[in-house]
Amino acid sequence: MGKYNLILSEYLSFVYNSQSAVQIPIYYSSNSELEKRCIEFHAKCVDSSKKGLSLKPLFEEYKDVIDNATLLSILSYSYDKYNAVERKLVNYAKGKPLEADLTANEIDYENNKITSELFQSAEEYTDSLMDPAILTSLSSNLNAVMFWLERHSNDVADANKIYKRRLDLFTIVASTINKYGVPRHNEKYRYEYEVMKDKPYYLVTWANSSIEMLMSVFSHEDYLIAKELIILSYSNRSTLAKLVSSPMSILVALIDINGTFITNEELELEFSDKYVKAIVPDQIFDELQEMIDNMRKAGLVDIPRMIQEWLVDCSLEKFTLMSKIYSWSFHVGFRKQKMIDAALDQLKTEYTEDVDGEMYNEYTMLIRDEIVKMLEVPVKHDDHLLRDSELAGLLSMSSASNGESRQLKFGRKTIFSTKKNMHVMDDIAHGRYTPGVIPPVNVDRPIPLGRRDVPGRRTRIIFILPYEYFIAQHAVVEKMLSYAKHTREYAEFYSQSNQLLSYGDVTRFLSSNSMVLYTDVSQWDSSQHNTQPFRKGIIMGLDMLSNMTNDPKVVQTLNLYKQTQINLMDSYVQIPDGNVIKKIQYGAVASGEKQTKAANSIANLALIKTVLSRIANKYSFITKIIRVDGDDNYAVLQFNTDVTKQMVQDVSNDVRYIYSRMNAKVKALVSTVGIEIAKRYIAGGKIFFRAGINLLNNEKRGQSTQWDQAAILYSNYIVNKLRGFETDREFILTKIIQMTSVAITGSLRLFPSERVLTTNSTFKVFDSEDFIIEYGTTNDEVYIQRAFMSLSSQKSGIADEIASSQTFKNYVNKLSDQLLISKNVIVSKGIAVTEKAKLNSYAPVYLEKRRAQISALLTMLQKPVSFKSNKITINDILRDIKPFFITSEANLPIQYRKFMPTLPNNVQYVIQCIGSRTYQIEDSGSKSSISKLISKYSVYKPSIEELYKVISLREQEIQLYLVSLGVPPVDAGTYVGSRIYSQDKYKILESYVYNLLSINYGCYQLFNFNSPDLEKLIRIPFKGKIPAVTFILHLYAKLEIINYAIKNGAWISLFCNYPKSEMIKLWKKMWNITALRSPYTSANFFQD
């Protein structure tokens, strides 16, 4: 078994090191004879440990179990009270504790003062500014570090250097914490006033960040960066990350391009050996120098020195260090401000009368025209989505907060809840549901606020609007997005594109006579100056659209949308400030509407067009591309002469002047070789991503359990690793050990083994090998998967009670009746299931399900129930296929150049051999004809799981299904009788399998699965015409080959002789595959 189990047993003896501690391994086997021995072994272990005897003789006697069975879990118990952390910590606390500089930050509470100085009493105290918001504690983190240090104290050579670096950094952390004592957390992993009052307020979150950083140190440079960030972030809780990462926006403009990848007409990346010189006016260097000076003023020494040294020759080879600094800067943790400061931040900008009215006008008109362009076709055709917009809104209503807690009655049960979906049901039941009236958000009904915290930026506020706003906007926004899907300007939404294509778009037009203008407009989006022109542009567009249709339902939809904009022009917000709730007039645009992303993109596109039209008055150029991506926009301009320093400087100053005419406080830069935006940056013709996901601090508390968070932690670690920030894997595994353990009683704990946590069951948390998703096919693996499936679906009494109440039933019936032309069980049941699933976000339901799952898990981890599940998983399919494959060695040369320098070597190698993928593989079934047919006549969107079920029904049932959703009987009949239907069967099966195999997640999303280089390693003689079987055989072969290459850096070729007789069996099985949802899959989804 793998490394995990080894670390697990070592960790247990490290933590529970007293005389009374006992660890009992529990084994299982799918072989019934061996299974009996496993049970005996366990019984005897428990017996011996009760008598206080050594377990060693049993390990000898049951050697067969230990050698041949599979470890299921380790039962550990220990009676000593758990102050072991403090005792161990003292040994590392040999240094001088840090002293916080109490004047480092402008806002008083952002200084790392002793808690009782910031909060006089427990009533005043809040942990919201420093809450790590993760279900693991500082003491566990300290334990994990000390465990690593102890394990590696005898390392030699280079490994010893890493040990010394980490030890040195940990000494700083340990000494500082030891001075005040380790803060004890409560059962919810929060730190209360009593614990914190005599300690620095930010101690915990700082220590978590520091541990995350020091466990990511490998090289000497890492050490210097980490040391500086650890020491300074103890005092500077506000601007450190921003200071350190600011220079990047200029650095990308300094490296010559010598060979790059460009997007060609076929939307593929293709190598181009062009050379583009970086042309940098002196003014830019002055700005950069100023940034570096600001870093020095803040006490940074080594990081500015590294940047300064790199500036000597600006080489691409050494740029990885710059990229590393940029990523590291985010790991100082989140900047969490009080809501009042976050809100007032936007309101501080003063109004200036001296603005260019003409530009504002042009901006508004561009927004208006874009809105019209986006919605013209659906409005003129009286699109059914716009006619049934209310129903569409209800069907996709989220279960997020509606801004206030209400008392709701479901049958005999009375509940307090803030959830939108529950409010809607309650309102409908009591005749209070009036989607035709958009409630005002003025001084009488101010908007409650949510928050968004990000490292390196100020806290931003989020409107929590009443659900009527969502219903009013949903359908229209969906239409806007589907327009954006096939409009290249909208980089974020453009159909199936990804970051790599956007990268090739920029580099494609860079040459000696072009420059690229890139602007971060996040300040503008939330500024007061944007509000009026922005909302007015939308309103004017909607007015024009209303005149294009005579359908009263479409007009009503547009009018309600318009009403949301009118209401929001006069918005007030409520902000808790101490014990008072302040009402403040808020004249800016905030996130929280359904339209936020779409509308911001439209506005940012209008903004850059306005600017370019002004620049065009003075220079002659062709705009090669304009792109907007979230808060950033960029454009490539091609001139008719070669670009000179003077030109760059002039254009740069003119652009800035034009923005200032609109009072837009934005960061606009001009370069000839690279750009830097929030999502990615291009330097030296290569693409980079910021590896800035925090591991040991979270932005906010959700309702995920420890298992979920362990999976999220692992998933974050993987994303960072792909982007060039690697944390020690042993440390991550230690955290998983801690976070997945289950307490039985105070002194008794159960630790699941690697097999439990990596088999794709409902409990999967991580992969035994980074980047490789394994689907176990051995007897023991399939056995344990079956066992877990038997306890996967947990019931919740509360949910059942709500679902059986009249209120809930009436709501589901209302939806079904509005949606369906004729009764249809599949759809009605689908709606009921979806609505019931939404109840999961109501904490009591979630907790109830979780408790049931944990207790079932406890039973299972102590003795797996042999359970003959009749469900078929993807593992069963792969298990059937596997024996027919024959492996032989093969050879693939490296033939593509690197374009993403931060990738780990093994992943980089695979891409260099088979090429990269620039598109998302369709795994939702939305490309199938049946899906298109349904969306043509109905607002209902079946999931891939539902399509998979439906398409395998009898033809008549499919026809009924379609007709009930409003598809005309003629069309439904034609569909079922045509060839398209059989193509769909294949398409949907393909999508479903891709979805199950997570082909669009992790590093698989980077590989070109249709690479001819990969195809030629696979030989499968063609027998009979079952495309689905051919597909699964090929896909299996590709995954096997790629996984082998990631693991071994070498290639194999596969030959498969699949018997014709087996094919039809396999094909039948393929229509009964059950999808498994686990913390692991939700974590993948969470990355999205």
From Swiss-Prot:
InterPro entries: DNA/RNA_pol_sf (IPR043502), RNA-dir_pol_4-hel_dom (IPR042032), RNA-dir_pol_luteovirus (IPR001795), RNA-dir_pol_reovirus (IPR007097), Rotavirus_VP1_C (IPR022071). Residues 501-687 form the RdRp catalytic domain. Signal peptide: none annotated. It is found in: Virion. It comes from Rotavirus A (strain RVA/Human/United States/Wa/1974/G1P1A[8]) (RV-A). GO terms for cellular component: virion component. Interacts with VP3 (Potential). Interacts with VP2; this interaction activates VP1. Interacts with NSP5; this interaction is probably necessary for the formation of functional virus factories. Interacts with NSP2; this interaction is weak. GO terms for molecular function: nucleotide binding; RNA binding; RNA-directed RNA polymerase activity. Its main location: virion. Its cofactor is Mg(2+). Pfam families: RdRP_4, Rotavirus_VP1. Belongs to the reoviridae RNA-directed RNA polymerase family. This is RNA-directed RNA polymerase. Keywords: Magnesium, Nucleotide-binding, Nucleotidyltransferase, RNA-binding, RNA-directed RNA polymerase, Transferase, Viral RNA replication, Virion. It comes from the Viruses. RNA-directed RNA polymerase that is involved in both transcription and genome replication. Together with VP3 capping enzyme, forms an enzyme complex positioned near the channels situated at each of the five-fold vertices of the core. Following infection, the outermost layer of the virus is lost, leaving a double-layered particle (DLP) made up of the core and VP6 shell. VP1 then catalyzes the transcription of fully conservative plus-strand genomic RNAs that are extruded through the DLP's channels into the cytoplasm where they function as mRNAs for translation of viral proteins. It is an enzyme of class 2 (transferase). Its EC number is 2.7.7.48. One of its GO terms (biological process) is viral genome replication. It catalyses: RNA(n) + a ribonucleoside 5'-triphosphate = RNA(n+1) + diphosphate.
